[in-house]
Amino acid sequence: MSGNLTQIEQDLRQSSEALQDLRSKYDGALLKIGEANEACKTELESKKTEALEALEASKSEQNVKIAALEGKMEELKSRFITDDNQILIKVGNNADEGEIASLKEALNLALQYAPSVPQSVTREKNRVVVEIQEGWEWVEAIGLYHIDLSHIILTQKNFDVPIMCDFSRENMHADNGLLVKLYLDNSKISIKKLHLKAKAKELTQNACWFNNYIYSRFGSGVFIEHLKLDSSLLTTANCGQAGDYTIFTDDGSQLLAHKIEIIKSNATNEGFCVCENSRAYVEYLTLSGGNNNYNGVFINTASSAYVGNITISGNSGHNGVLISTASSAYVGNITISGNSGHNGVLINAASSAYVENITISSRSGHQHLLVDGSRLTNHASCNFTGGSTGNNQKLAIVRGGLATVAGNGYSRGAGNDANQAVGVWSAHGSWCFYGNRT
């Protein structure tokens, strides 16, 4: 019996010790769990604090960026956006007033801002305007290749004060033997009003036949409200070669203009040219000033033109108006008061023309009007009051030409005798008069 009690006592003692050991392990485990929880809590709080601090820093950084962006927007708005919600970029010499010195830079900037104008804005206001300020001089040439700037309006603040243009070779765009101030290759541009005047320059120094203000080719388009080109200060010691070609539309290009004024000089070769399957629509075309070397107006090689009024003063070395090589033209009025070295109006080489009124009050070296293998319809009047030199023929039709004069035809004076009447001359061609002829 005593042996059993002893065994029970030992078993209880061992169980108690095991329980104490288990209790100790349990307390140790709880302590470690508490320590782990505390460590996790501390780490979590630390990460939370770091995240909040990073968030606040990011918000602060974003606020700085937003403030900078808002400031930039306000700057751009005050600098460029007008009351009409147009974007106005000024080209000039006053950087403090936000003016940009480079026209090329201004056009690039305009090209960037153009898509940002809201579509909800009306068409009259949905545009970007590049405005040249008074006193700015055009030095850096511009070449446009495969770019459409027709939605950007190029203009100047004061049309009465010309923009002086540097025609030095190093400041002209060179391409395929051409020197040009504004060159377009498969490109488009819109001009509201520009008055350009070339600075004094001897063009033989450029070693180039073609010196132009604007030359467009290869499917380009030029849209003009009012353009005035003044070449009166240009000179050349090599007449007929190194010269000025003002504005030239070439190689399948288009010209749409309300009014173009050209002031020629002895350095001007062609006054106004539309060539190589090109198209032109001009309401008012005026040529004045000095004596150009070739033609006043030249429409050539399968080209076509509508010109409301052509007015030419100042002599033309060859022809006042030449329509040539399968070209066609409608002209409302041709008025020539400057002498022509060859013909006042020449239509030749399978070309055709419809002209309402032809008035020539000056002298022509050959004929006032020559239709050579071509067709002319003169609807209203054909009035010649100036004498001719050379063969003294006022009206001439040759080599299969046909001229229809539906209005009154006048032929008065020849050579140096304004009272000497002259008839109509025709060789292998025919006139058809529907009005009076004196």
Where are these regions (language model features)?
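N-terminal extracellular ligand-recognition/capping segment immediately after the signal peptide
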Residues: 95, 104-105, 115-177, 196
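Right-handed parallel beta-helix
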Residues: 155-157, 188-198, 218-238, 251-266, ...
